[in-house]
Amino acid sequence: MVPQGINRQFVCVMALSLALVCMVAAQGNQRLLGEAMEKQAQELFGEPGKQALVQWARFVVDQGDAYQVDKERQTLEKVNAYFNTRLEFVSDASHWQKEDYWATPLESLTTQAGDCEDYVIAKYFSLIQAGVEQNKLRITYVKALKLNQAHMVLAYYADPSSDPLILDNINPRILPASKRRDLAPVYSFNGMGMWIERQQGRSIKVGSASRLSMWMDVLLRMEQQGLQPWLDLPDRQLTQ
């Protein structure tokens, strides 16, 4: 028989652990959601915008709570599936009446639609907030050879010299770039820089992504839509 004192001690430890988990989850929710962000989403996009923000934030916080570096592939799979199943592919001309438009994640989720850039942008910010380091992710402009058209995917590098995994809305399977012979990379970028992609996986850094006006416009609109916390790196990445 276990002494009663040990039982009480165990219960206290478990209760404290649960309280800490709940506190961390609450902090994550507060940082990526919050009353002010909900109100602004509703003012800009109505109730669908508010609900899209709430669902998105809760999903990402859940991924962050479950995040483990050695199980990063699971986070990639869940985030990739989340957007591939929630967004319908619609061209910019039909969706926004513009030849080319890069939507913010909130715009895409509110309208439940987007084109290739919109899938990638939403996955990029979601993965960073879920715990994946920014330097492992590159938004990559490619040519889709079978379709003979420009396309965009998200590349994940486990380390700088690795064969990146490709997150795509056309092919929902996450595969190494070496197995995506249907894609020819042109250039890539993230919040840390911009690269020209060469053959055999070689990349040449060419400076900052600030030269990409479409990217800078997305960042500005996210800020205007009250999504500044989604642009900030999580605390755990700032301390690395």
Please give the residue ranges for each predicted region.
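Bacterial N-terminal signal peptides
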Residues: 12-21
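A structural boundary/capping signal
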Residues: 24-240
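N-terminal secretory signal peptides that target proteins for export/translocation
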Residues: 1-6
